[in-house]
């Protein structure tokens, strides 16, 4: 049976960094470890497969060979010859076989810094009006002693003796030769003989930094703000990554947001619903009076234009929609109960056609339903 791709086994991309590979291995190894799956032959085989993939992909030389030749690189006779740091043969065949096998004569560039993500919780008011907030994030910053070179102060990285600074080595097999990343310097073309005492040759140190982030008015949950160059510092002077601030708007006790519109429920008593009147309602800009017409039914929506959220992209301003909820009175006194009884009598009972047309229609429908059943 053909062996599975090592990258596929670990669930990582072919450009994955070593820390991504280690993280994937740790997760899968814990899941399929024999101690946690005693007697499970399938899990045992899976664990061996994961371990094999990890051992190859975390070894720079083995990984480079695997990327070039696949599983054939580790079969007997799969790779002959050895490493050669010269450049003459590459001048003849490099353009042809470099393209075919993914090699190339250029030195591998130092890795750009990783992007970072920060989850920011905002109140609805902050999201609507905009706000400036200070955040503190852990990150990797350029070492201030070696200025990112990784070398001890007063020294410089030295040219790699294996690849002579090209970052590439040649694998010979018979008449043909292919290039791959130098396993000695990992493609950088230089080596650090005396590492910096502070960053230990990495060119970066762990730090926390404080940033002032300006949140524009109108943002909503799911919006993302990019701060260029505020991610982790790049390796050995490479560009820094970016910081992405992910917005999450907290639930509001009064308003619900849908796009640029706001919704709220406005409770009114049945007397106001029947007779009409004015009631004070909240908006994000303060209190305003809402005119309720007579004979208003529960669920009726009243639109207050321009009282919603201004679009984060400018221009459009949303509305505030007030949904009326007619409340049934509670805690009635005997006098109030009698007044309601008298009122109900004046309606002609609970199904009064004139004053409760929907009730009349409903009960007429119920009567017809049962009449049809008894026929």
UniProtKB/Swiss-Prot annotation:
Positions of the J domain: 5-70
Cofactors: Zn(2+)
Gene Ontology terms: cellular component: cytoplasm
Keyword entries, A-Z: Chaperone, Cytoplasm, DNA replication, Metal-binding, Repeat, Stress response, Zinc, Zinc-finger
Zinc fingers, CR-type class: 130-208
GO biological process terms held by the UniProt record: chaperone cofactor-dependent protein refolding; DNA replication; protein refolding; response to heat
Entry keyword annotation includes Protease: no
Residues that, per the record, bind Zn(2+) 1: 143, 146, 196, 199
Main location: cytoplasm
Sequence ranges of the CXXCXGXG motif repeats: 143-150, 160-167, 182-189, 196-203
Example of a GO MF term: heat shock protein binding
Complex and partners: Homodimer.
Family (UniProt): Belongs to the DnaJ family.
NCBIfam families attached to this UniProt entry: DnaJ_bact, PRK10767.1
Role played: Participates actively in the response to hyperosmotic and heat shock by preventing the aggregation of stress-denatured proteins and by disaggregating proteins, also in an autonomous, DnaK-independent fashion. Unfolded proteins bind initially to DnaJ; upon interaction with the DnaJ-bound protein, DnaK hydrolyzes its bound ATP, resulting in the formation of a stable complex. GrpE releases ADP from DnaK; ATP binding to DnaK triggers the release of the substrate protein, thus completing the reaction cycle.
Entry note about domains: The J domain is necessary and sufficient to stimulate DnaK ATPase activity. Zinc center 1 plays an important role in the autonomous, DnaK-independent chaperone activity of DnaJ. Zinc center 2 is essential for interaction with DnaK and for DnaJ activity.
Protein's recorded name: Chaperone protein DnaJ
Organism: Salmonella paratyphi A (strain ATCC 9150 / SARB42)
Lineage: Bacteria, Pseudomonadati, Pseudomonadota, Gammaproteobacteria, Enterobacterales
